[in-house]
């Protein structure tokens, strides 16, 4: 969330890394490495910050967030962004600490905190080594384009993928991840404004209100 277990089990619009998924991967024994001329999976950055737009079929909505990703220490922080006034919409901060097996959900306005066990083990945001190379192409137009590579969990020429990952050919930055179930896109995440490193490691430290955290996940609407 590849056989790695389901990679990112997404249970809510902000949980790309459980949130998964933080993540929904089902890579079931992918094919052997390609021929000598076939590109090999690159190594995605271990620590970066950026933004994401997440579309989830279950809600039919896009959600935006700031992301701090620390693969070295197996932790992720996601901060909801407000791009429009949505009545009865609560914004949260999510701190996922996989080494501790716990996620903190903090309401931005009140600092109310929920502490929730993480059921899935850490699974990095990267290209699994047994992925299938699909294509390489440029995004944008003349003078303003970037080369990317597309990978999937497709096993043979006749099978269908359940995961598609797009990463830059240079530096291996994540661009987009898409998860498919029963021929339908269930989750799609676009990454942008990616910068290497973590400016402030304290973003992974829960606020003091989490010392008395509630054990249940808070809802995204106005009701508790």
From Swiss-Prot:
The answer to keyword Kinase applying to this record is no
SMART domains reported for this sequence? EPEND
Q: Name one GO biological process term.
A: cell-matrix adhesion
Q: Name one GO molecular function term.
A: phospholipid binding
Q: Does the record's keyword annotation contain DNA damage?
A: no
Family recorded in the similarity comment: Belongs to the ependymin family.
Which protein, by its recorded name, is this?
Mammalian ependymin-related protein 1
């Amino acid at each position: 969330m590849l056989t790695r277990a389901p990679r990112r089990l997404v249970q809510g619009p902000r949980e790309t890394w459980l949130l998964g998924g933080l993540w929904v991967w089902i890579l079931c024994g992918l094919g052997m490495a390609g021929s000598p001329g076939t590109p090999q999976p690159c190594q995605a950055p271990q620590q970066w910050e950026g933004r994401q737009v997440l579309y989830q079929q279950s809600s039919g909505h896009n959600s935006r967030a700031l992301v701090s990703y620390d693969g070295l220490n197996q932790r992720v922080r996601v901060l909801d962004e407000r791009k429009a006034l949505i009545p009865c919409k609560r914004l949260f901060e999510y701190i996922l600490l996989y080494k501790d097996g716990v996620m903190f959900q903090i309401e931005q306005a009140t600092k109310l905190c929920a502490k929730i066990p993480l059921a899935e083990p850490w699974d990095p945001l990267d290209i699994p080594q047994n992925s299938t190379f699909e294509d390489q192409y440029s995004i944008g137009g003349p003078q303003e384009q970037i080369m990317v590579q597309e990978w999937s969990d497709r096993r043979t020429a006749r099978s269908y993928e359940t995961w598609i990952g797009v990463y830059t050919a240079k530096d291996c930055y994540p661009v987009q991840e898409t998860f498919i179930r029963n021929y339908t896109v269930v989750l799609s995440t676009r990454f942008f404004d990616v910068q290497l490193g973590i400016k402030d490691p304290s973003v992974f430290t829960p606020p003091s209100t989490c010392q008395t955290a509630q054990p249940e996940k808070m809802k995204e609407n106005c009701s508790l």
